[in-house]
């Protein structure tokens, strides 16, 4: 598996007057993302402060697999988050947890 840097951006349904946790279906989105983390697919993730974007570091075999993994996210279907970019990433400094099997 390879590492990918994934940028997700706010979609048309994002409500700027609400916090992250106040967006529609927050609990379902959080559960979904936590499951990806527990499975070792999402290694790191969080909002990029001062931007409408989120950075994820994900393990996958291809960019298409990244898209497939994120498709069931409730926030994808609600157009709260969209994938803006999927780029192969090489870790040069530091270490990440070993992938789950």
Give names to the regions the model predicted.
Residues 1-101:
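Conserved, structured core segments of small domains
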